[in-house]
Amino acid sequence: MKQVLITGGAGFIGSHSADALLAQGFAVRVLDNFSNGKHANLDAGAMTTGRLTLVEGDVRDAACTDAAMKGVDAVLHLAAQVSVPRSVADPVESSTHNIAGFLNVLDAVRRHKIPRMVYASSAAVYGVPEALPLTEANTAKPMSPYGLEKFINDQYAALYRELYGVSSVGMRYFNVYGPRQDPKSPYAGVISKFADGLEGATALRVFGDGSQTRDFIYVGDVARANALALQGDVTGVLNVGTGTSVTLLELIDAMKEAFGKPAVVRHEPPATGDIAHSATNPARLTLTLGWAPVTTFVEGLRALAQSLRAT
């Protein structure tokens, strides 16, 4: 049985990726500092049997990261500081997670001669799109320290492939949503915040007129993409999205139906630096890994609503 190390494996995308890998017969080791992840996100049954093991630590700690690498066959690196506003407020602190932490992981993969690394890049590297839909060939023009950090990750990964032969691919996630995304977290996406508003009967804040578009992708489909990438040999970067975008007002209508609740929308002035439209073409992901999204937008929203009512 092959073993995969997931950094940030108790978090939102990480825990779903752990579930996907466990379902495919892999053993999983999770490295997490629980600054954002939760013990409740981890499969208790798999921990009891030993198929899922936990190392509590931080990727910024080189010795801890090195120790967690021992005996693993692949690494899924998801640990990060993922708040764009936080990166703007404190770029130096953000870089310790997203550049220094990334480099600790990447270099440990090199030293331990681990055959495969998949890591979280981001659609934030593109900045304001020159044209839509976005492909991997689009020029990177990050608008935040977070986006720049992710682009630097991509450059380091490319250099390590060239210099040391480290096989890696960066997953440029678009707008991921689904169960276990904490709406109270500063990292929460718009869907989890709207879900919290619907459940709490509070107004949904929309910055601008609501015509902004986003490519929303269900976390289970992201987890499948991660699992496929770990087992593949494609390198470089891959856009991870559905190829379909919806406006925020369309999103609210769909959520009202999925949650079975009315919504009060409060329009506020447009947010500074907000990107009006975003969508990707996931053709390279489909071509190289045979991936396609299987969860419709309505199904994903219903799964989110059901998970919130179960907690």
Model-predicted segments: where are they?
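N-terminal Rossmann-like NAD(P)+-binding domain of SDR-like oxidoreductases, especially those catalyzing
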Residues: 1-174, 295
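Short amphipathic alpha-helical interface segments enriched in basic and hydrophobic/aromatic residues
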Residues: 39, 77-80, 195, 199, ...
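Residues in well-ordered alpha-helical elements
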Residues: 63-66, 73, 85, 92, ...
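A conserved pocket-lining segment of Rossmann-fold NAD(P)-dependent short-chain dehydrogenase/reductase
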Residues: 87, 137, 166, 172-182, ...
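Active-site loop immediately N-terminal to the catalytic Tyr-X3-Lys motif
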Residues: 91, 183-184
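Hydrophobic alpha-helix immediately C-terminal to the catalytic Tyr-X-X-X-Lys motif of short-chain
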Residues: 152, 156, 160, 190, ...
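C-terminal substrate-binding subdomain of Rossmann-fold SDR/epimerase-dehydratase oxidoreductases
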Residues: 198-311
